[in-house]
Amino acid sequence: MARTTFQGPLRSLGGIYQQGPATVVEITTSTTLTPEDHGGRIISIGGSLAAALTLTLPTINTSANSTTSGPGQDPSTANNEGVMYTIWVPTTISTSSLKIGTTSGSSDLYVGAVISIDSDTSGAVVAFSANGSSNDFINLNGTTTGGVAGTWVQIVAIAADKYMVSGNVIGSGTVATPFADS
């Protein structure tokens, strides 16, 4: 994603959106996500994974060129506050698992909740929330913790050490929380 160099607020009366083939990024192997390559895009994962796939979120940086630094902010700043990652599972994860974790050694944790839907029997709907104190992984196994086709999770770097999570996690069997400490 290109970085802009304009100064001042951006105003659009017609809205701002991304479109085209680069809007959806397909990932088939473990990857460290970056704001430039994955932020604001739909990350598509699913199907028969060759091995457990881990998406690693970048460490949240709110101190580089903060909002209090005034006009003329550096377009190449390392500050990634507000970057949003949308992970979508178009085909049920069938042979392994998907883990979405924060960078090892960082103090970044999840806050927020996902709605979990039992797709195979009762149609039960349950909300699971991250505990905000130790959960640094979202684990989707294709069954009880989600990862059935149609699952999506949106993750936003909302503040220092906090990734805000929302989404619909579709599972089968007795659904369980996808939030974990590893």
Which residue stretches match the model-derived regions?
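Exposed extracellular interaction/assembly regions and N-terminal maturation sites
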Residues: 3-120, 157, 161-182
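Residue-level signal for functionally critical sites in structured catalytic/ligand-binding pockets
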Residues: 2, 89, 147-151
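Short aromatic-glycine motifs in intrinsically disordered, low-complexity regions
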Residues: 1, 55, 140-144
